[in-house]
């Protein structure tokens, strides 16, 4: 729901502001209230947003926070399955010159994949935004890495332009202040690259295109695809490119994709990728971690798998509140992100973890990495993040991705090494000065004796 609120606000040019309240009403029974300052949802679309699973378009090849097509509807379903209670939504939105407000209570019809309205009420709205209230059972609140608090904390580092106020079940109120006042540039939709599509993708294009021939369907649906390249595919596969797309078979789609693998294409355009930016990452890390040292960078766009563009962003923070506290001791912390969204599960199998663990940290002045007050930040930006599983919480260890993460992090590690060396040198200098200060009275006294003069005051 946080990512949905961010996306809606940014599309409207609004700096996101979210209020979250998690109230415990019994053991493993909670009420969640989530409200934002976005543009609101028109009444006709409220139940579509909250009650339709996989409502997004399969072929929007655009960098997005959303991962699974579940989002808010998944939350509504879980609430309904564990408590039987309906969702309650208040939406305030602009319709022409009028500011409208509607209160709705509804449930999800799972079989029909749509909402069932139970109650609705108009009311005078004062501002735009959405508030949703859900109940959950058989869940627990935790301060662990996979818990709500940690998710919000990490979200703020990847989204420093937002403000989130969170009241936890104990009544404690956390205010995560905005560290940047710039609404991010919206990413542009780009055509898929031939090296990044599957046979299923090609078949989907064929069944949903308005083009009349394979040739025009391929040139209009894929980047870096010209009539000349289509003619090459026709020669290599023997498939008639003047056939109707709706008649395409799985075997033909598979043959076309296998042909793509043998061909060379220009790298895809990278103007559809919008990174957070090193300056914004630094602001976010400083706001949350308050470190003694910080360094960030954004790498140039490159490709993996022969044709999928991606950008790696990295940050390293040392000292202050960096790292995580375990048994009252600060240990190292790895923060993994994909398109600004924290990945809090399946850390061990992730390419980001693999890349960071493969670095020899002793070379950079960190003798015991696991027990050092350091936080590592890595964000992968792509229209097609290569997740390892359907859970979409860990990134596949593609060689190009692992290489980029290592290069980015080692560049920052060298800067940290300089800081640690300077810190060590300053400490040694201070120790030498202290030794001199301790012996100074003795030296003065002995010098006075040699000069047969009185000891100066």
Could you tell me what each predicted segment is?
Residues 40-42:
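A short glycine-centered beta->alpha linker in the GHKL/HATPase_c
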Residues 23-32:
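Short beta-strand-loop-beta element adjacent to the nucleotide/active-site pocket used for signaling
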Residues 36:
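Acidic ATP/Mg2+-coordinating residue in the GHKL
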Residues 1-20, 24, 71-78, 155:
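Conserved ATP-binding N-box helix of the HATPase_c
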Residues 31, 45, 56-197, 204, ...:
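GHKL-type ATPase core
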Residues 210, 214-237:
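Helix-hairpin-helix
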Residues 174-200, 229-232, 241, 327-421:
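GHKL/Bergerat-fold ATPase module
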Residues 206-207, 221-225, 252-256, 262, ...:
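Charge-rich (often acidic), low-complexity intrinsically disordered regions concentrated
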């Amino acid at each position: 729901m946080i990512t949905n609120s961010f996306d809606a606000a940014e599309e409207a040019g609004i700096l996101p502001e979210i209020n979250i309240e998690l109230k415990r009403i019994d053991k493993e029974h909670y009420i969640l209230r989530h409200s934002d300052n976005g543009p609101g949802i028109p009444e006709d679309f409220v139940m579509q947003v909250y009650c339709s699973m996989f409502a997004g378009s399969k072929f929007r090849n655009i960098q997005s926070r959303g991962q699974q097509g579940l989002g808010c509807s998944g939350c509504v379903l879980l609430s309904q399955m564990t408590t039987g209670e309906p969702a309650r939504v208040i939406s305030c939105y602009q319709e022409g010159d009028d500011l409208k407000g509607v209160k709705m209570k509804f449930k999800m019809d799972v079989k029909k994949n749509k909402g069932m309205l139970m109650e609705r009420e108009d009311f005078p709205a004062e501002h735009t935004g959405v508030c949703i209230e859900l109940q959950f059972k058989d869940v627990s609140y935790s301060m662990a890495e996979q818990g709500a608090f940690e998710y919000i904390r990490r979200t703020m580092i990847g989204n420093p332009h937002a403000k989130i106020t969170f009241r936890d079940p104990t009544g404690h109120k956390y205010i995560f202040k905005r560290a940047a006042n710039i609404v991010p540039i919206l990413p542009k939709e780009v055509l898929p690259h031939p090296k990044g599509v599957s046979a299923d993708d090609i078949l989907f294009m064929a069944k949903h295109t308005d083009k009349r021939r394979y040739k025009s369907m391929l040139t209009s649906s894929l980047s870096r695809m010209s009539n000349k390249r289509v003619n090459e595919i026709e020669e290599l596969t023997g498939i008639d490119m003047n056939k109707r797309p709706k008649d395409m078979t799985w075997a033909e789609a598979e043959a076309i994709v296998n042909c793509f693998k043998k061909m060379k294409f220009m790298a895809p355009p990278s103007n559809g990728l919008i990174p957070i930016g090193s300056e914004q990452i630094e602001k976010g890390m400083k706001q949350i971690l308050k470190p003694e040292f910080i360094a960030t960078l954004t790498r140039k766009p490159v490709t993996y798998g022969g044709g999928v563009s991606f950008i790696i962003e990295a940050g390293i923070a040392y000292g202050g509140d960096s790292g995580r506290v375990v048994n009252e001791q600060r240990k190292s912390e790895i923060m993994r992100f994909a398109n600004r969204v924290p990945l809090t599960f399946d850390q061990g199998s992730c390419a980001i973890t693999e890349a960071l663990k493969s670095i020899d940290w002793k070379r950079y002045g960190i003798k015991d990495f696991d027990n050092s007050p350091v936080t590592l930040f890595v964000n992968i930006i792509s229209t097609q993040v290569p997740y390892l599983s359907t859970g979409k919480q860990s990134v596949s260890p593609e060689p190009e991705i692992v290489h980029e993460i290592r290069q980015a992090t080692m560049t920052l590690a060298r800067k940290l090494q300089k800081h640690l060396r300077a810190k060590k040198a300053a400490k040694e200098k201070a120790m030498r000065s202290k030794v001199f200060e301790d012996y100074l009275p003795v030296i003065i006294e002995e010098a006075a004796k040699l000069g047969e003069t009185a000891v100066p005051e």
